């Protein structure tokens, strides 16, 4: 039994497959730190952000859908997957030099978040590139294959590590003052990921005026 199948069955022990396939609703966000919501004109102005949405993973043998919460900054990433009933099935906390994964009631650690997630869950998810793609930005290893009528990337390919990732930007939206993707589809071989971003909030450092109490 492969890792994805074993992990999928673990999730299904919390909730039936039929209810996992179509997910909605909200989740409680973690407490705020020293970052505060800001408005930006372009996503590259946001050095940190948080999002809520949905993630679907599909292979020839298995498929999984979950609610996604992701809080990203240059120093730290916090990623959580939950069922539609709010049950947490995976949490990943990562810094540039360390990663901690809690999954199926167990804890795992590694120096690299992407390697750790693939080793434990079997998911080959491009965590290093996703922050750019989620915000509609192009990395140095990406080749844009087509653009839409507004010059937004429509399809790109990243072949830094074969097999290549092919990314399709299916729709766009305005969030926090910036245009970002609403739906994306990523394919690499027989692995398919679908992302839907329902809420995206740009974050910045809170500032305290002179004479103002913190």
Swiss-Prot record:
Q: Which superkingdom is the protein from?
A: Bacteria
A Gene Ontology cellular-component term:
cell outer membrane
Q: Which UniProt keywords apply?
A: Cell outer membrane, Chaperone, Lipoprotein, Membrane, Palmitate, Protein transport, Signal, Transport
What stretch or stretches form a coiled coil here? none
First and last residue of the signal peptide: 1-25
Q: What is its main location?
A: membrane
Lipid attachment in record (S-diacylglycerol cysteine):
26
Spell out the disulfide connections: none
Lipidation sites of kind N-palmitoyl cysteine? 26
- Give the UniProt subcellular location, in the record's own words: Cell outer membrane
Entry's transmembrane regions: none
Q: Which PROSITE patterns match?
A: PROKAR_LIPOPROTEIN
Membrane protein topology class: Lipid-anchor
InterPro entries of this UniProt entry? Answer: LolA/LolB/LppX, OM_lipoprot_LolB
* Gene Ontology annotations of biological process type: lipoprotein localization to outer membrane; protein transport
Similarity comment: family membership? Belongs to the LolB family.
Q: Which HAMAP family match?
A: LolB
Quaternary structure note: Monomer.
Q: What does this protein do?
A: Plays a critical role in the incorporation of lipoproteins in the outer membrane after they are released by the LolA protein.
Name of the protein? Outer-membrane lipoprotein LolB
Which species is this record about?
Answer: Shewanella sp. (strain W3-18-1)
| Designated gene of the protein | lolB
């Amino acid at each position: 039994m492969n890792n994805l199948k074993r992990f999928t069955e673990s999730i299904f022990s919390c909730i039936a497959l039929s209810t996992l396939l179509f997910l909605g609703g909200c989740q409680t966000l973690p407490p705020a730190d020293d970052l505060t919501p800001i408005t930006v004109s372009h996503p590259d102005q946001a050095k940190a952000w948080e999002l809520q949405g949905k993630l679907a993973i599909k292979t020839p043998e298995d498929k999984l859908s979950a609610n996604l919460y992701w809080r990203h900054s240059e120093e730290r990433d916090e990623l959580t997957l939950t069922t539609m009933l709010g049950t947490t099935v995976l949490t990943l906390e990562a810094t540039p030099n360390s990663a901690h994964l809690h999954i199926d009631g167990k804890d795992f650690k590694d120096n690299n978040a992407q390697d750790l997630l693939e080793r434990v869950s079997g998911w080959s998810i491009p965590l290093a590139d996703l922050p750019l793609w989620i915000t509609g930005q192009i990395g140095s290893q990406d080749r844009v294959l087509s653009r839409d009528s507004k010059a937004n990337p429509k399809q790109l390919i990243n072949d830094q590590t074969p097999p290549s990732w092919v990314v399709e930007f299916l729709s766009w939206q305005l969030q926090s003052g910036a245009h970002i993707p609403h739906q994306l589809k990523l394919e690499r071989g027989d692995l398919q990921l679908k992302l839907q971003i329902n809420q995206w909030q740009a974050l910045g450092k809170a500032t305290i005026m002179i004479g103002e109490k913190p």
